[in-house]
Structure formats: C-alpha cells, structure tokens
Amino acid sequence: MRSPPELALSIQLGDGSPACPVSRPRLRRWVLAALQNDARLTIRFVGSREGRRLNRDFRGRDYATNVLTFGYEDDGTQGPANARGRSRSGAAPARPVVADIVVCLPVVDREARAQRKPLDHHLAHLVIHGVLHAQGFEHDDEVEANAMETLETALLRRFRIADPYLPAPSASADRRGARTRAPAR
C-alpha cells in the first residue's frame, strides 16, 4: 500500500484579501484528499484587484476569477499546470507537484451566495479543483470535464459536501438535474 503523499503547504494572504474563512488544518485536509503525489503548494488568497490582474496577465481575461492554478517545473520555471506528464489515462506524475493556487475570495463569496451554498463548501470545491489542475487534470473538452467533475464530486463527498454541479435546491424545475460548467481555472 502506498503511503500518503507528503505535503509542504504555504498559505498566503494577498493585498486586499479578506482573512481566510477556514482553518489551515481544514485547507490541508482538502488538499491531501485530492493529492496523488508529494507536493509543494502555495494557496494564495487574494482580493478582486489582484485576482483580476493575474487572470488578465496570464489568461488574457480581464476579470477576477474564482481560482487560478500555476504549475511549475522542478527547475522553478512556470509551465502549464498539466506539464507534469499526466497521461490521458489520468496516471499520476512520478515527481512532486509544485504549484501556486490563487483563490479570489470576493469572487468565491459572491458565487457561493448566488448558488446558495455554504462558503466553506464552495471553497473546498475550488481548492480541490485547483489541486487537481496542479496535477494535470483539465476540463477542455466534455470527456475531461466529466472525469474531473466526477472526481471532484467523489472527493467532496468525503467531507459531506453536496455535488457542486447540481443546481441549488431552490432552482427552477426546468433546471433540475442539469449540471453547471466547471469553474474557471
């Protein structure tokens, strides 16, 4: 049996970021649930201004998004989050995962309210989503998106968190059963 992955986790608060609404041990549990290999990760909580700047500078989208994942190669150079050699089969990379995960708390809070979800549930989903991206998971096409969403849902279930892709209970009847798209990365 394989031993649990080793995790070096750094938590940062960016300028204009509200305090993180959950404890460090709780964040660590979410990360470890999604982690398949040893990792050195930083989770940086940012405000809207920094979130917008990063999304614009690195993705060409001029708005703050909920979560961004920046993967790094062993030599410290930035590469795509999936540059660790994950195969299409989803096999985990052999070397440690090194990444920064940026969470824009004002966006996460706004989305949680709009979706009528507890903030900590939505945050757990996005942290897990970012960790999966750091390991090479993508949602660029329907097959990849379904695989990633299925894994996210299973991981969240361990924490008694409902499927994030199902509509809120008060959604109109014509939306029941419809899945929403994966969050931005």
Residue ranges and their predicted role:
Residues 126:
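Residues within the DNA-recognition helix of helix-turn-helix
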